[in-house]
């Protein structure tokens, strides 16, 4: 038997079955870096049309997690697929470097700026820390197989970038969008600074829920508004609030002008509440006996006076549209210093804007009753005062969603402070942004409604911060008028030049007289820094417009769904404020990473999946396959079990590639490829199937439908290849003569297929695709990533794909019949069987034209096709209209091909072989036409 084994063309390859990705991937990464593969990709696409995916900068703090991996791998898939499509698709990664998280980490080591360390030294430590974090994250991103200009990234703390932030501010000032104001802003007491909306998280919090009586100064003027002319007695407008600490700042009670309000007679006093809320309000107050004495619109009470519940001052009734009847009383406590709606109402009625709370969250010393008390602890004291004055109508605790600082996880407050704002309406910026939103392609399309809603409802953007580590606002304001210096734009450019040379310390170290001369004594130098969302938001200016390898606007921005209120928003706002257009053509959004049950990943919950552990255990390509396998438009689940399933899918893909490579061990494409006209029909079918599939895959890449690519490739490996083509060609590949047309036809097809297949994989399974590419025979390019989509297909005559689809279906039915026969113990392998297929007039010609090669379709020792009319009685008809009869072969088994044939032993020189094998090991080359 051994001598016949040596006559077979058994597969052989150096491409290992075991991937060992955690070992091979770092070696390949080092090889890419040593060869400068990214630079060579760029060189190969010089002069091609550009495609710009602009990277949203991750924060330079801490190791990467699975959300980072999801984002960067998705971007990498896009960049690589666009490169294969012929685009020059550079990828310039970025990092966001200023701001509080870095300050906090540095504070842990050296203390607060200005106490144990000077602000200048503190900023140097922040810069040093951010640089160290970039080094860590750069290595971790590269380990994921993400190609890019990693050693020329954009970094928001680079001097030239900081200078451009300042210049961007100048452009927005020039266009009339900056204004200063004393307005309520999100304020974190722990940070001691204003917060951007994107820095606010909403979490559940237990708060007091109280109703407070505001008594009418002159009940008669209220009662006269009701047609019933009720008798005069005390009258109360009750308010409901969950922030009792804001009551010292109350300046009005707000009603809705068009809501119907009811006059409730409760015996000793009247109450005016929204008609829709009467029942719930009276129940809350424990008042069961009452009557309604009249109705009136809210607008009729405008300017009437009420008594503040614990101060001597009187406050007016005012009107506004934000009042609802969803909860409360329909009468809204209004403190202009502590809320954006309250502030706007206050502005329209010129209410006093008095802020009783200091930056540290404590009431100022001049605040009657509550001086020095922290607002976070003041509620109990305020409730006691209200109760003592008999104005506390109801009190309970509720659990509700409340804004918290994203970093400290502590409840934040609204606090009126002097700040700088990008006005949304001063120069019609809001409408201009909305107009630009309509021009952008939003994927998924709900992104458009989401960001539109945010823009329509957002207040002015507070861009000033009271922090040490950030880009300064290089402004001078007049000490008396508080107006900006008349030469502000010129001064900003001079400061930008200084920062470009020496960094942000150039401003903080600057003596005002250096720029203003004698004028300096009349001006205050602003010490605020800018919101970090402005830092990253102007990357379209500092990066896209200042890097010659990039273009503005970008083709794509691609980030998580939280960036509709973050980077998408700040980028859009600044771009429109600076030059009137959106910075992107398409915005893609992916969901959050969650566990298998859709819950947020958390170390405390025990469902956290460590990225480094996944990569070290499974390899980056398994993680990349996980990314591609999910529909990123929704939340993306990850767990050890999900990764293991992807590892199983990976093995099927790898084994498909390995089979193709192993059967090309003696194939030289330069000399062994055969003419397309000589290809067997099955090989032509396989090539045509690949060409059609490639069109589908390219379309899916262009539409960013990566999960469809995963499904198509997996189906191709499992169905088209694994259970059909690769199974059928084994006999021909192994048993026919080495240089026969039949075998070289198969190898020619496999050569084209493995090259195309590997390029399909490359954007997703980058390391594995490169490994396959280096094993494919022939003179291939240095790296697969320099290639285009495969286009060296043989010119194939028309192949009837429907016929082969039908043959595939019949084969599946035959396999079922063979398995049933095997289960009954009548046969062992399929080669121990002979099959007769009885088919109708539609299917029969497709089978009979294969002639003797029909048995190779079923991988049985004998097969024939007959009209269905000849089918034995009782033989079941399958869904595809055929009947199948399986019998055990009575013939001897060929020692070489294992087929059981009547002619085994007829050749005396090779008594163990069938005549087909005798011919294949001698001068006779078996001829095949179809399979």
Swiss-Prot record:
It catalyses: tRNA(Ile) + L-isoleucine + ATP = L-isoleucyl-tRNA(Ile) + AMP + diphosphate. Keywords: Aminoacyl-tRNA synthetase, ATP-binding, Cytoplasm, Ligase, Metal-binding, Nucleotide-binding, Protein biosynthesis, Zinc. GO terms for molecular function: aminoacyl-tRNA deacylase activity; ATP binding; isoleucine-tRNA ligase activity; tRNA binding; zinc ion binding. InterPro entries: aa-tRNA-synth_I_CS, aa-tRNA-synth_Ia, Anticodon_Ile_BEm, Ile-tRNA-ligase, Ile-tRNA-ligase_type1, Ile-tRNA_ligase, M/V/L/I-tRNA-synth_anticd-bd, Rossmann-like_a/b/a_fold. GO terms for biological process: isoleucyl-tRNA aminoacylation. The keyword Ligase applies. A motif ('HIGH' region) lies at residues 58-68. Its EC number is 6.1.1.5. A motif ('KMSKS' region) lies at residues 600-604. Binds 1 zinc ion per subunit. L-isoleucyl-5'-AMP binds at residue 559. It is found in: Cytoplasm. One of its GO terms (cellular component) is cytosol. ATP binds at residue 603. Coiled coil: none annotated. SUPFAM superfamilies: Anticodon-binding domain of a subclass of class I aminoacyl-tRNA synthetases, Nucleotidylyl transferase, ValRS/IleRS/LeuRS editing domain. Belongs to the class-I aminoacyl-tRNA synthetase family. IleS type 1 subfamily. This is Isoleucine--tRNA ligase. The lineage of its organism: Bacteria, Pseudomonadati, Pseudomonadota, Gammaproteobacteria, Legionellales. The gene is ileS.
């Amino acid at each position: 038997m051994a001598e016949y084994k040596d006559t077979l063309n058994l597969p052989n390859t150096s491409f290992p079955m075991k991937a060992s990705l955690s070992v091979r991937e770092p070696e390949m990464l080092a090889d890419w870096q040593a060869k400068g593969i990214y630079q060579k990709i760029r060189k190969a696409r010089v002069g091609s049309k550009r495609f710009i995916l602009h990277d949203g900068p991750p924060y330079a703090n801490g190791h990467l997690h699975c959300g980072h991996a999801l984002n960067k791998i998705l971007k990498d898939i896009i960049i690589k697929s666009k490169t294969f499509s012929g685009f020059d698709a550079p990828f310039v990664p970025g990092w966001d470097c200023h701001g509080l998280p870095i300050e906090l980490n540095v504070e842990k080591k050296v203390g607060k700026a200005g106490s144990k360390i000077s602000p200048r030294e503190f900023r140097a430590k922040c810069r040093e820390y951010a640089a160290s974090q970039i080094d860590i994250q750069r290595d971790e991103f590269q380990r994921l197989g993400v190609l890019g200009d990693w050693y020329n990234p954009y970094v928001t703390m680079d001097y030239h970038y900081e200078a451009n932030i300042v210049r961007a501010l100048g452009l927005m000032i020039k266009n009339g969008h900056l204004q200063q104001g004393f307005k309520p802003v999100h304020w974190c007491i722990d940070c001691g600074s204003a917060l951007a909306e994107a820095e606010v998280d909403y979490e559940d919090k237990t708060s007091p829920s109280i109703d407070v009586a505001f008594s009418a100064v002159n009940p008669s003027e209220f009662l006269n508004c009701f047609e019933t002319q009720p008798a005069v007695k005390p009258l109360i407008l009750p308010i409901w609030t969950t922030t009792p600490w804001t009551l010292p700042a109350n300046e009005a009670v707000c009603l809705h002008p068009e809501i119907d309000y009811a006059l409730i007679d409760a015996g000793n006093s009247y109450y005016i509440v929204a008609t829709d809320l009467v029942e719930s309000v009276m129940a809350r107050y424990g008042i069961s006996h009452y009557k309604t004495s009249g109705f009136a619109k809210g607008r009729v009470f405008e300017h009437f006076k009420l008594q503040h519940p614990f101060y001597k001052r009187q406050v007016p009734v005012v009107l506004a549209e934000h009042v609802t009847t969803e909860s409360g009383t329909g009468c809204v406590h209004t403190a202009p210093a502590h809320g954006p709606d309250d502030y706007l109402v206050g502005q329209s009625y010129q209410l006093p804007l008095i802020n009783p709370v200091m930056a540290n969250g404590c009431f100022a010393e001049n605040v009657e009753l509550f001086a020095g008390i922290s607002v976070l602890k003041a509620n109990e004291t305020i409730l006691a005062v209200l109760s003592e004055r008999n104005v506390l109508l109801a009190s309970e605790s509720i659990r509700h969603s409340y804004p918290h600082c994203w970093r400290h996880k502590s409840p934040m407050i609204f606090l009126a402070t002097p700040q700088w704002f990008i006005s949304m309406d001063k120069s019609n910026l809001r409408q201009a942004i909305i107009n630009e939103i309509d021009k952008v392609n939003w994927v998924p399309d709900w992104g458009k409604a989401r960001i539109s809603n945010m823009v329509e409802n957002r207040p002015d953007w507070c861009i000033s911060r009271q922090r040490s580590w950030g880009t300064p606002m290089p402004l001078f304001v007049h000490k008396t008028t508080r107006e900006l210096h008349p030469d502000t734009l010129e001064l900003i450019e001079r400061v930008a030049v200084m920062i470009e040379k020496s960094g942000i310390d150039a401003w903080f170290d600057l003596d005002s007289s250096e720029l203003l001369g004698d004028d300096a004594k009349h001006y205050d130098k602003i010490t605020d820094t800018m919101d970090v969302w402005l830092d990253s938001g102007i990357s379209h200016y500092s990066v896209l417009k200042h890097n010659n390898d990039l273009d503005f606007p970008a083709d794509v921005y691609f980030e998580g769904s939280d960036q509709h209120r973050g980077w998408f928003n700040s980028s859009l706002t600044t771009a429109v404020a600076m030059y009137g257009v959106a910075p992107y053509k398409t915005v893609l959004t992916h969901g959050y990473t969650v566990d298998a049950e859709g819950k947020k990943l958390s170390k405390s919950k025990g469902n956290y999946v460590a990225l480094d552990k996944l990569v070290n255990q499974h390899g980056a390509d398994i993680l990349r396959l996980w990314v591609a396998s999910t529909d990123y438009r929704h939340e993306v689940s990850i767990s050890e079990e999900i990764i293991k399933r992807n590892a199983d899918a990976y093995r099927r893909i790898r084994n498909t590639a390995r089979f193709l490579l192993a059967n090309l061990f003696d194939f030289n494409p330069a000399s062994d490829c055969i003419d397309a006209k000589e290809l067997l029909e099955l090989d032509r079918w396989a090539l045509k199937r690949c060409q059609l599939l490639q069109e589908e895959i390219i379309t899916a890449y262009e539409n960013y439908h990566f999960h469809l690519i995963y499904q198509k490739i997996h189906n191709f490996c499992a169905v088209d290849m694994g259970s059909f083509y690769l199974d059928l060609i084994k006999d021909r590949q192994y048993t026919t003569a080495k240089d026969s047309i039949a075998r070289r036809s198969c190898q020619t097809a496999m050569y084209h297929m493995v090259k195309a297949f590997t390029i399909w994989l490359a954007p997703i399974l980058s390391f594995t695709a490169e490994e396959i590419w280096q094993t494919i025979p022939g003179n291939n390019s240095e790296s697969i990533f320099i290639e285009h989509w495969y286009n060296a297909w043989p010119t194939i005559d028309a192949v009837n794909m429907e016929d082969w689809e039908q043959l595939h279906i019949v084969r599946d039915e035959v396999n079922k019949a063979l398995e049933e026969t095997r289960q009954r113990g009548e046969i062992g392998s399929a080669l121990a069987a002979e099959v007769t297929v009885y088919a109708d007039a539609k299917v029969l010609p497709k089978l009979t034209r294969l002639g003797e090669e029909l048995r190779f379709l079923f991988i049985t020792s004998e097969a024939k096709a007959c009209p269905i009319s000849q089918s034995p009685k009782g033989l079941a008809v399958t869904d595809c209209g055929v009947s199948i009869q399986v019998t055990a072969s009575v013939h001897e088994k060929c020692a070489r091909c294992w087929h059981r044939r009547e002619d085994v032993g007829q050749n005396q020189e090779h008594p163990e072989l069938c005549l087909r094998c005798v011919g294949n090991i001698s001068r006779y080359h078996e001829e095949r036409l179809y399979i």
